[in-house]
Amino acid sequence: PFVAGPPSDGQKRFLRALFEAANEQQKFLHDGVRSGDMVRAVKAVFARHGLSEYDVYPPMHGIGLAEAESPYPDTESDYFLRSGMCVNSDISLFGHPDGSNRIEEGFVITEKGPESLTPLIRELVVKGI
């Protein structure tokens, strides 16, 4: 996520919600987790912050040759994440008065949790604003 210049208080609140959702998602990026459960957890963070109307895309998609390829889960998805899957976390909000922003990270799903393919982004998300 980026802001040109110093962030306003509204932009800070907005970014904190994105960071919170990205960090919450980490709890679900494990072998055997139902993909819809992960989507609902991310959406719950946005709902707590009153940001649901700006959440327009699923929070994860596959890594490959096309944009937003499978897996592309929604709240009703019942397939499981499996070790060895490579996914992009795509935590994003669009059309908010304080701006639109996205945190996109790559991960390999493992039995112990997500292995980051983008460690600098992961470090910045954990650090927050």
Model feature map: region roles:
Residues 1-129:
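Active-site neighborhoods and metal-handling regions in enzymes and metal-associated proteins
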